[in-house]
Each structure stands twice: as structure tokens, then as C-alpha cells.
């Protein structure tokens, strides 16, 4: 292969690596702020067992929410139901992330974002019982467990702790 082809492949790989959602969406140094992990849970309002397709992070109203990978803001939407105020980012390479129950937005549709940019703030909008962030990762159209994507933020010991905390079978906040 030519030198130019190798440079092009390297740039594509760098773009892909910066696009993968690889950090936590809120600052969470003590790892005590997850409320509910991915999987079946008792819905806090409907009181039925339901698949929780993301991870809930409890935090104070107004806490900053960060883009977990580079991408383009696909959706900025407000609703009194469901996800409430939410942002969806298309990261390319088959990845999308959803950030729900926000109090405020810090982005607009079509805006390019970088990993670590503030995209919004913790809220209690939509079908929610307390201030928190509901965070989802989608790969090739399928919801996947977000806990497997925090590798840029956590040491192996912290990662083990996060797995343990997120596997609790408590109620979700949405």
C-alpha cells in the first residue's frame, strides 16, 4: 500500500476511536451515582417488570452532561412524557447515544460535538421520579449495555465496581 493509503487508514481509525462512546456522561469520581443499570427492572410508575434499555445516573439538578464520543447532534427534543427533554447524538460507525430527562440543552440539532463537550444538564423531565440522567448506547440499531463503554474513564478496579453497582436490581427512575 502507498504511504497516502496508510495515512488515510490511520486517520479513519483515529476518527472511529474518537467517535466510540467511551467515557461516562457525567462526572462520577466516586462511582456512587448510578441508580439503575441495563436490564429488567420494576418500573417506578407503572410497577411492572420492564426492560430498562440504558443506565440511570443520579445527580443534582443542573449537573453537566457530557458527549461520550465525537458526533453530530441528531435530535434535541422536549416532551412532557417519556424521555422528557432529550438529546440523541449520531457518532457514526453504527453508534448513537441518548441522554434523557434533561433540564436544559446546551446543543442544537446538526451541531458537531467532541467527546467531553457539555451537551445539557441533569433534570427531571418526562416520565421520571427524581433528577437523573437516563443514558443509552445503540450499536447498529440495537440497544447495548452502556457499562461496557466506560473504558477511557475507569481503572480496572473502578470498572469492576461500576459493573457491580450497575447490576443492582433496584427500581429505575424512568
Go through each PLM region and give its residues.
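Non-catalytic extracellular/periplasmic "stalk"
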Residues: 1-33, 37
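Catalytic cores of peptidoglycan-degrading enzymes
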Residues: 26-172
